[in-house]
A protein has these predicted regions:
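Patatin-like phospholipase
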Residues: 1-60, 68-308
Length: 308
């Protein structure tokens, strides 16, 4: 069965990378959201089961991390991170925050565990061999603007750009890359639809971490993040203050594309309410299972959309 799944996936990815004058460029967008992204992990595993592939993949924060496993063809890897490893205090804990200044153990998650010889390593060769483009933002802490990383910025056993895209302000220290510091990509571009369209995507499949119809309110805890960041990173504070505006603009644009038949979206039902830092494996498993179920139930709709 594994061989059959792999064959279908390789055939689809080869087709995705083959080009052609009449063919539309189809992009996959995976929203961030910390542990809420267990939902998109389930959807992506269902995509792998059916050999569903895309020309271009854009992910934000944990959504970018999910995409790396998906593009490497490592089914169930994301589920293990959300549903098994999450109980390890090195993954997520107040102990981490006290010891390192980061609630999430980004070096542990995307370094120690992910590197060759780690507990659950990424198949780096498979990721690099995949013809699909991969783009994900991180926020330059000094400017508050998005920098878009690609697969070319990743090196074997060096996944700092992924860590940077997941470094939530206040909850995590910024990640240093070549002398510059970066925070979570969601601060500057939570839904990089504009980037996707600029790069040539004409059709979009979007996986959200929040319920259908969600619009973002102004950032909460403003006094906390302003006090923590304003002296060193005032432009990051400014980006946080306006994050909801760019998010809602992108969301409304996706909805317009959906009405025009150029976008297809998946979103959790809202029945399972979790926070970004939830650590309950049973809740994570339920959210993941819902993602698998939703994707399977809508597989014909998805395939019809991709073939139009």
């Amino acid at each position: 069965m594994q061989t059959d799944t792999t064959d279908r996936r390789e055939t689809c990815w080869n087709r995705a990378g083959s080009g052609g004058e009449q063919r539309q460029k189809v992009g996959l967008l995976v929203e961030g959201g910390g542990m809420k992204c267990a939902y998109s992990a389930g959807v992506l595993d269902a995509f792998l089961d059916e050999g569903i592939a895309f020309d271009y993949c854009a992910g934000v924060s944990a959504g970018a991390a999910n995409l790396v496993s998906y593009l490497a063809g490592q089914r169930d890897r994301n589920r293990r991170y959300y549903c098994i490893y999450v109980k390890d205090p090195r993954y997520l804990s107040t102990r981490n925050f006290i010891k390192t200044g980061s609630l999430f153990g980004l070096q542990y998650i995307y370094g120690d565990m992910t590197n060759e010889g780690g507990e659950d390593p990424l198949d780096f060769d498979a990721l690099m061999a995949n013809p699909s483009e991969l783009v994900f933002p991180a926020t330059d802490a000094a400017t508050g603007k998005a920098r878009y990383f690609t697969k070319r910025d990743l090196r074997r056993n060096h996944y700092e750009p992924i860590m940077a895209s997941c470094a939530l302000p206040v909850m995590c220290r910024p990640v240093e890359i070549n002398g510059r510091y970066y925070f979570d990509g969601g601060v500057s571009d939570s839904l990089p639809l504009k980037k996707m369209v600029k790069d040539g995507c004409t059709k979009i499949v979007a996986l959200f971490s929040k319920p259908d119809g969600f619009l973002m309110k102004p950032q909460g805890h403003r006094r906390i993040y302003t006090a923590a960041l304003s002296r060193r990173f005032p432009n990051t504070v400014e980006a946080l203050n306006h994050r909801h505006e760019q998010y809602n603009r992108s969301m409304k644009r996706i909805r317009r594309m959906e009405q025009e038949g150029r976008a297809l979206t998946f979103a959790p039902s809202g029945e399972i309410r979790i926070k970004t830092s939830t650590r309950d494996p049973a809740v994570m498993q339920q959210l993941y299972d819902n993602g698998v179920r939703d994707a399977r139930e809508r597989m014909k709709e998805l395939k019809d959309f991709l073939q139009k």
